[in-house]
Amino acid sequence: MGKKLLQQRAGRGGINFRSPSWRRVGKAKIPNIEGEHIGKVIDIVHNPGTNAPLALIKLDDGTKFYVPSVQGLVVGQKIQIGKNAAISNGNIVEVGNVPEGTIISNIEKTRGDGGKFARSAGTYGVVVGKTGDKVLVKLSSEKIAQVSSNARAIVGVVAGGGVTEKPLLKAGNNYWKYKVKAKKWPHVRGVAMNAVSHPHGGGLHQSVSRPSTVSRNAPPGRKVGHIAARRTGRKEGA
């Protein structure tokens, strides 16, 4: 009898495949508040499982919340929140009041959702246009997102963008990297396994030796490889 595939084990929801959410510092989102406020950055902390540091902000009314920290933000810095907030690094402003060409991050899609775009380390969006009650924002992926003009965002680039420039150097560092994520590591190739462990395994060779395309309706133990692929391999003339 064959063994379960990696994705079958993950689907069961065991501890090795679950994200350790109990290690997180807390939710990082813009609070759903109205009016004008002055806040102070009281701490910048590491959030396990993410590369972007979180800034802990305390408002003048005593409210505390976390947001993804932007580059240049320091402990003790005063920030403004509200419709009339200045377009300055770290301030939380309404997207409709932001001039074209301004770099923003942690961008809400609709007001009150806390932030949906440009939240990971080193990412940002650029305001490229305004149409009625919508604002066009160019994201790091080159896609254009439409957000409400009263949605809010943080001025600046999310910190931690250089994390991928530092090499991991050894497998032990990669082990700890994946330890705080909902992923299983290391990932073993199917062709390197025994035939009992994977449909691509066995044969004393490093090739699939059969078509790797499988039906969308294949049973779970066979559904691996190029699933319902229209084509495989290089394009002609490429």
Swiss-Prot record:
Belongs to the universal ribosomal protein uL2 family. One of its GO terms (biological process) is cytoplasmic translation. PANTHER family: LARGE RIBOSOMAL SUBUNIT PROTEIN UL2, RIBOSOMAL PROTEIN L2. GO terms for cellular component: cytosolic large ribosomal subunit. This is Large ribosomal subunit protein uL2. It holds the Pfam family Ribosomal_L2_C. Transmembrane segments: none annotated. The gene is rpl2. Residues 199-238 are annotated as: Disordered. NCBIfam families: PRK09612.1 (NF007180).
